[in-house]
Amino acid sequence: APAPEKKSAALEWKPGTKILLIGGGSSHDYQKWFNEYDTKVLVAAGYSVNYTEDAAVAAKELANVDTAVLSANHGSFSSIAFRDSLTKFVDSGKGLVILHPGLWYNWGDWAEYNKTIAGGGSRGHDRFGEFKVNIIKPDHPLLKGVNSSFSITDELYYYQPDPAGTPIEILASATSTQRAGDYPQVFVVKHPKTRIAGLTLGHDGKAHELAQYQQLLLNCVAWTAKK
């Protein structure tokens, strides 16, 4: 007999500012770090948090939340339903944090995502290892409580702004040891209708367990949620 059709169940929300974590895909332990660990950090800060790897659930739930944290790189997220939902979400003024894998050029059939929402993207990164993040604009709310520079063991993404896309404001950068150039690590996508924060860090526990990373994540969520 064929397997029963999977129904996309609605998520249950507790009172408070609602944060939807959207993950799933390849090359990362999404459940351990982007779900369980980041959820623990955000719940401890008083947020109502849910995580999904289901593009259909995410498309439906975006209408119910204050901020989304998008780390997914799975192909299912280029569905028309999710594209439309995310576009409406940002156009309505709701906040968006784009995290590590979400800043890749993941969806070849959805160029508008990188151009308009992410302001650019990455197609490569240094080998996993230690590097230094340097703060450029320490007075910005995204960098509240963050050291002027700190070391992290992570993937240094070669994120590059799209010259034809939504402009970005770089708040922190890192210099690659494996190719020429400085690359944005923390930035704002200057979308005309909402607040979008970009955080290229976060490959695994070496980042997610780091106090500086956790502070950046909390800052990104608070700023995009206008809290």
Please place each PLM-identified region on the residue numbering:
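A glycine-rich, often tryptophan-bearing local segment used as a flexible ligand/cofactor-contacting loop or short
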Residues: 76-145
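His-enriched metal-coordination microenvironments in redox/metal-binding proteins
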Residues: 26-28, 100, 125, 179, ...
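Extracellular ligand-binding/catalytic regions of CAZymes and related secreted enzymes
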Residues: 4-17, 44, 177-181, 191-227
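Catalytic beta-strand/loop cores that center a nucleophilic Ser/Cys/Thr
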Residues: 124-196
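Oxidoreductase and adenylate-handling cofactor-binding alpha/beta cores
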Residues: 113-119, 150-155, 159-166, 212-227
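Hydrophobic/aromatic beta-strand patches that form the interior of the parallel beta-sheet core
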Residues: 20, 97, 171, 197-199
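Extracellular/periplasmic catalytic domains that process cell-envelope and extracellular macromolecules
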Residues: 12-15, 43, 60-64, 90-92, ...
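Helical hinge/lid and interdomain linker segments adjacent to catalytic or ligand-binding clefts
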Residues: 11, 20-22, 27-105
